[in-house]
Amino acid sequence: DRKSWIELARRWHALPVAIVIDPGIDICIERNESRPDRPFGGEVVRRMVSEIRRSQRGLEREGFRQVWKLTSPDAVDAATMTRVPLWTDKRGDEGPFDIIGDVHGCADELQELLTKLGYDVSWSSADGTRKVAVSHPQRRKAVFVGDLVDRGPNSTDVLRIAMSMVASGAAHVVQGNHDRKLERWLAGRKVTIAHGLQQTIDQLQAESEGFRQSLPKFLSDLRSHVWLDQGRLAVAHAGLKAEMIGRGSGAVREFALFGETTGETDEFGLPVRADWA
């Protein structure tokens, strides 16, 4: 019953994956005939293989995040399993860190803050493309707590700074609810365009097509939270329960974005947050 496996994974905020072993009908019949405790014939094996192949097509819809298929005995023999940390798990990064809260489009203030913290911020322009490089002489790293955009006068330069710092390894960025809303708008999803988002949209209209095209991947790659410094530090936008740290699920992302909610929405269409801390 694969449904119970999916439910178990979700309960513990894990990402379910599937490994499908399908070496072919002939191999399955041969292996079945070599087992004296299996009295059913080849037709039963054919039906079972056919059913398994039909069900494979729905594994992603069932909730499996990744599916690996091994289609021969050689593939099975050659397969290895490697444990890979989830993208939230950056415990090996020990900093030191500067944690920066919601910037909300205030690029000048962000640059002033970074300068006061000892970062070198250098702007350049080539072929009409505005670029920025940010580094710290002592290799400190910024951790942005989300909500880079909306409300402020210059969300585009805030994005430039954050994108440059992530690309160079000078920063981590977790996703805020405003960042996710912009991501959804860029993907053509239906969102409520309130005052803050409209400001960001207007600012983006003045940017190059290349810059606008670089945003969807950056925003979609933002993690729900980041786990740092050998497990001593976890950073999320709205908060996170201890059992969710370092885990990956839709529930973890929603909690990190909005905190614990009551299930209701306010007059702005935003989730009503419960007092949970």
Language-model segment annotations:
Residues 44, 137-139, 151-235, 242, ...:
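Active-site neighborhood of divalent metal-dependent phosphoester bond hydrolases
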Residues 1-21:
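Glycine-rich phosphate-binding loop used to anchor ATP phosphates in small-molecule kinases
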Residues 11, 23-83:
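Conserved GTP-binding G-domain of TRAFAC-class P-loop NTPases and closely related GTPase folds
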Residues 26, 104-105, 179-180, 240-243:
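Short, solvent-exposed loop/turn segments at secondary-structure junctions
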Residues 244, 270-277:
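Conserved beta-sheet core of the metallophosphoesterase superfamily
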Residues 75-159:
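N-terminal active-site segment of His-dependent metallophosphoesterases
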Residues 12-17, 63-66, 140, 169-171:
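Short glycine-/polar-rich loops that comprise or flank the Walker A/P-loop
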Residues 99-101, 144, 173-175, 235-236:
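Short hydrophobic beta-strand that contains or immediately precedes a catalytic carboxylate
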